[in-house]
Structures are given as structure tokens and as C-alpha cells.
Amino acid sequence: MPVPQVSVFLDNHPGSLADVIEKLDKNEIKIYALTIADKGEFGLVRMITEDPAKATRVLEEADFNLAKARRNIEVAVVLITDKDHISRITKILGQNGLNIDYAYSSAVHFEGKFALVLRVNDLEQAERILRENNVDTLSLDDIKRHFA
């Protein structure tokens, strides 16, 4: 199931990330996964949150620079298990002509296993191929249930 991602541009200086996280915390929005890409003068923060629409609204109201071009990005979240190692998942996607644009892991653990967030060039096809290969993909509701 596709999972919505929130992306925010931040000035690259101490405390910028803390400001974003504090704003989400004050509004009781949980963060399930987070990554930061250094872009020189600024950073790009990508997050999976408990309520992406609310997180977007709260951050926009606080004048954070949300990545407009990445506003409605959805990602795949796969469960890494004994049978579904990262190597198997990336091989399945690559053999089917799918490119992984970026990946990051989730802070949510599922009975000792972790989730991997994947941005691929064709999400619908990736989800279908992963299902056909019996790879467990997670929805936002699945993540919420395991985080509680």
C-alpha cells in the first residue's frame, strides 16, 4: 500500500531539525521514519508521520518550506524479514526494471524486524511485483498499529 511522505526544506544550521520535530511533537504528531539529505545550504527532510495531512498543515502554518514538488509523494514500505532481506527485495525490483530513487529505514520495529521505506520510479508496478513475490508491504494503518 502506498504511504504518504512529508518533505521539508530546512536551512542547514544547528537546531533546524529540532524546530520541525518540536512543532510536530507539540501537535501530537508521531514520526515513524525520518531521513535527511544534505543539499549544501539546506537540507531535505523526508518523514513518514502518523497524520501526513495534519503534519503538512501544521508545518505550513509555521512557515516551514515544504517541498511543493514533492507534496504528494507516496512511498512503499516493506517489512524486512528472514526471507525478505534487503538484497532479495532490491534484486526483485531491479530485475523488473524498477529503480530505487532513495531508501531509508523506519523507527518502527515489528517483532524484531524493521521496515524499509522505498521511493521507486513506478510505485504501482513495484507494489504489484512485491505482492507477486510474497513480500510484505505495509500501509500507514499497519505502521500505526505496530507503533502503539
Located regions from the model:
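A conserved regulatory-domain signal marking ACT and ACT-like small-molecule sensing domains
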Residues: 1-148
